[in-house]
Amino acid sequence: MKDVAFGQYYPAKSFVHNMDARVKILAVIAYIVAVFLVQSVTTAQGVAFQFLGFGACLFFVLIATLCARVPFGKVLKSIKGIMFFIVLSAILQIFFNASGNVLAKWSFITITDVGLLNAGFLVARISLIVLGASLLTLTTSPVEIADGIESLMYPLKFIKFPVHEFALIMSIALRFIPTLLDETDRIIKAQKARGADFDSGNILKRVKALMPVLIPLLISSFRRADELADAMDSRCYSGSKVRTKYKKMRSTWRDLVATVAIAGLICGVVALNVTGFLAVVVLL
């Protein structure tokens, strides 16, 4: 459970850590848009431009990680945490995509070249999105994320949307992700000390073995929620009141540099898509 990096803040003094939280949130959204803008093309020329687009997104993440002074292993843990989902998605693409040239066939399972390309495309897209999202949570504290979301959603207050309450919910959710992961790890170790086996057997047996973990975790979650509610109540917390900020967010030259960089990434991906499309049209 400690392999999941999403939601865990890594304190450091770096270019990215000192950026405005609002700019970081918008930059991650723009980065995800750039990843989705990379088109899926099944021709050889189109695939080359497609992976150039993914390469540009990966280069952007690597530069951002270096500027954030976050260990690469810490960022890669986010991929390890969802490896099962990534592998399952790739298998479904490979075995159940009938379009393209058939490379192998067993019973109802057909492996085609298009299926392999789509599987690689899907793995690259999911991995890049998770890397970018985890970099946001690693370099931005839950309080900063909540303040950033509240500031960005401020115009919704005019239509009576509970912006502050929504930001508070997001902040608490992000704050409790690492707490619940640590609690899960502690319960699993306690169960293993009592002779529980979570590593052997098929997937159904492993899921069944996790039942003694889920029930204590659920009880612990409710207990922590009650403790947090009591703590907020004892401090007379009220989300409806106008609240001041200890640290006000201000944009600096770092945010301008990041904005130019993400705009350049999106323009580059769009240019690669257009070039790849034109190359395919010319060949046809």
Task: Label the model's feature ranges.
Residues 21, 68-71, 141, 145, ...:
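Amphipathic alpha-helical protein-protein interaction surfaces
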Residues 1-49, 53, 58-61, 154, ...:
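Transmembrane alpha-helix interface motif
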Residues 14, 65, 106, 135, ...:
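Short, flexible active-site loop motifs that bind/organize anionic cofactors or intermediates
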Residues 55-66, 79-87:
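Small-residue-enriched core segments of transmembrane alpha-helices in multipass membrane transport
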Residues 78-196:
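Juxtamembrane/interface alpha-helical elements of multi-pass membrane proteins
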Residues 37-38, 65-70:
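Structural signal for the C-terminal ends of transmembrane alpha-helices
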Residues 71-79:
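Interfacial helix-loop-helix linkers and transmembrane-helix boundary segments
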